[in-house]
Structure formats: structure tokens, C-alpha cells
Amino acid sequence: MAAGPRNSVLLAFALLCLPWPQEVGTFPAMPLSSLFANAVLRAQHLHQLAADTYKEFERAYIPEGQRYSIQNAQAAFCFSETIPAPTGKDEAQQRSDVELLRFSLLLIQSWLGPVQFLSRVFTNSLVFGTSDRVYEKLKDLEEGIQALMRELEDGSPRGGQILKQTYDKFDTNLRSDDALLKNYGLLSCFKKDLHKAETYLRVMKCRRFVESSCAF
């Protein structure tokens, strides 16, 4: 392996292991670039985990002939579709960093309850062999986004919560067709919401710190 890619992998692993600053002023401030790098890496990891789990669940439980029709029916299922959040990179670029951070936080917080039931659904899953840690990973990303908000907010009052609903918990009765469809829909929303959060964070990072990886 060439030195460049190997060093990049080692740097990414090191950043994932870094803790977030707990209180502003308690410890030397982490550079804003590092806060963004940490948040983006965590969001990418969670989005990939969600995408892999969705595909694995689909292969295991959803007949191939039914997938397209079910996916179309899921289009209006996600609670996050009811908030005025950007739907893609171009729309995200029209919003301020503080707005994007608030939307990211709302998306992450809406899953903190449901994912606590995820390990019961995927007890034998190859992807979710460590599924009991998904909640901790989401909490870690939540803390990172909150750290960025503390750095970027100018002291103006925060806007009210836009999304007060959370998602239903995952159903552990996998012998029920209704439960399978419910879990399939939830996993689809989980994947979509984490993709949005990752996109928002990458847009913010790229426009603040111009870099070659901004094309996505």
C-alpha cells in the first residue's frame, strides 16, 4: 500500500477516536477544522452502517419482486420529510451553517429512541454484530454537532424545535409481515436521514475549508 492512502486511513482512525470537548473553556479549544472533520467522519460511518443494514434486511426478508413497489410506498413515510430541511447538496448550499447544524441535530435526535431496539432485531446480523453501540455512536455525533453549534452560534436565541416527533421503535416480531414492512420502512428512513445529516456536514466543511474532497 502506498504511503499516502495508508496515512489517510490512519488519520481517519485517529480522528474517530478523538473525544469531543466537553465544555467550552474547560480544555484548550479544538480547532474548528477538527470539529468538522470529526463530525463528518462519524456521519459517514453511521450512514454507511445504515445503508449496509438496509440492504442486508432487504436481502433477508423482502422478496425481490416486491421491493420496488414497497420502496415507492415509503416515499412519504419519513417524519423528516415534514420539516423544511434541504433535500440535497444544492439546497443545503443555500442555507447558513447554523441552520444546517440545527437540521442535522433534529435528524439525529429523532433516532435516539428507536435505535435502542435495533440490537433486538439484528441479534444475528453480520452488519450489526455490535448493534448495541449504534445508540452510543448517535449520541457521540449529537455531542459533536452541539459542539459545533456552540462554536458557530453568535449568541442569538435558538429557534424552536421543528421536529418534535420521534420514530416508532423497531418491531422485534419478525414473523409478522406487518412488522417486517414497518422495520423495512424505518431502516429506509434511517438511511435517508443519516444521508441528509452527512450531506449537510460535508457542505459546511467544504465551504469553510476548501479541499479536493468537496466533489460529492
UniProtKB/Swiss-Prot annotation:
Residues where Phosphoserine is found: S131
Disulfide bonds: C78-C189, C206-C214
Entry keyword ATP-binding: no
GO molecular function, one term: growth factor activity
Gene3D superfamilies: 1.20.1250.10
One Pfam family linked to the record: Hormone_1
Signal peptide: 1-26
Residues that bind Zn(2+): H45, E198
Protein keywords: Disulfide bond, Hormone, Metal-binding, Phosphoprotein, Secreted, Signal, Zinc
Compartments, as annotated in UniProt: Secreted
GO cellular component: extracellular space
GO BP field: animal organ development; growth hormone receptor signaling pathway; positive regulation of receptor signaling pathway via JAK-STAT; response to nutrient levels
SUPFAM superfamilies recorded: 4-helical cytokines
Keyword Phosphoprotein tagged: yes
Family matches, as PANTHER family: SOMATOTROPIN, SOMATOTROPIN,PROLACTIN
The family this protein is said to belong to: Belongs to the somatotropin/prolactin family.
Function: Plays an important role in growth control. Its major role in stimulating body growth is to stimulate the liver and other tissues to secrete IGF1. It stimulates both the differentiation and proliferation of myoblasts. It also stimulates amino acid uptake and protein synthesis in muscle and other tissues.
Protein name per the record: Somatotropin
Species this chain originates from: Felis catus (Cat)
